């Protein structure tokens, strides 16, 4: 709780499993409140949440979805960082809104402060759960332990994985006490290896290393340096159309094929 700001945690084996658990918690929360009437989920275009059926259903990229449709129903898509687009999708049947705090595969787009605060306020007003996916952007990558901590908001449910175990397969979804008490109960969800001793030892060590090696401070310092240098490249080369990101999660948008650049970078 001290690190994440959340109250309860359920350990999984991967990020996709964490998303599955988060979606189930949201659906169960709405079911206990309203029965089978309010089960719609709003996700974002160009998002990525995983390749299992539930996670894929809230992934807004046809490249991943097409071969596996029809997917889980009652999912609507809105445009990221466009509050009006989200608002128009909300109805009395909406139970959750899910998005990455920083869209990764979608092009390195951090949520704007206005967008995330407006969505949070809308969720509070309509008793809709806000699910923030921190699987790619969390664990210090943006300069804070979780990217949402840079905004004056808090999710109802958060997903985490990847760097949380530093290479050991582990994921988690975290909830506020309110959601935990009014959603999943014993038998609603399970995992064979989630929370196993090896995984939890790895997580514990990763957390220790964050403090011992001043990782967050280093991300802020090196992130500022990277931002400055990428800005210089953006000015220097016409083929670079945009520079976006925060901390060490940054990217360049180019109007040319970048395969050669990527291969050279890997070699170097």
What are the residue ranges of the model-derived segments?
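Conserved N-terminal phosphate-binding loop of PLP-dependent enzymes in the Aspartate aminotransferase
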Residues: 1-268
């Amino acid at each position: 709780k001290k690190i994440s700001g959340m109250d309860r945690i359920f350990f999984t084996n991967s990020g996709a499993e964490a998303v599955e658990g988060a979606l189930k918690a949201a659906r169960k929360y709405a079911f206990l409140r309203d029965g089978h009437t309010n089960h719609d989920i709003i996700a974002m275009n160009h998002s990525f949440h995983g390749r299992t059926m539930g996670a894929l259903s809230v992934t807004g990229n046809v490249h991943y979805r097409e071969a596996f449709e029809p997917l889980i129903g009652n999912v609507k898509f809105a445009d990221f960082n466009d509050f009006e687009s989200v608002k128009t999708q909300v109805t009395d049947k909406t139970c959750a809104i899910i998005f990455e705090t920083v869209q990764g595969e979608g092009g390195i787009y951090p949520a704007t402060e206005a967008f995330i605060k407006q969505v949070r306020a809308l969720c509070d007003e309509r008793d809709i759960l806000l699910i923030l996916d921190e699987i790619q952007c969390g664990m210090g990558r943006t300069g804070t332990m979780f990217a949402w901590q840079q905004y004056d908001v808090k999710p109802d449910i958060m997903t985490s994985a990847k760097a949380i175990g530093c290479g050991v397969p582990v994921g988690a979804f975290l909830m506020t006490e309110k959601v935990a008490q009014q959603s999943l109960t014993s038998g609603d969800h399970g995992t064979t290896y989630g929370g196993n001793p090896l995984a939890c030892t790895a997580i514990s060590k990763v957390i220790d290393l964050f403090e011992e090696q001043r990782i967050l401070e280093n991300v802020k310092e090196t992130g500022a340096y990277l931002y400055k240098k990428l800005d210089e490249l953006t000015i220097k080369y016409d083929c670079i159309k945009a520079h976006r990101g925060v901390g060490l999660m940054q990217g360049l948008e180019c109007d040319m094929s970048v395969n050669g650049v990527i291969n050279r970078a890997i070699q170097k």
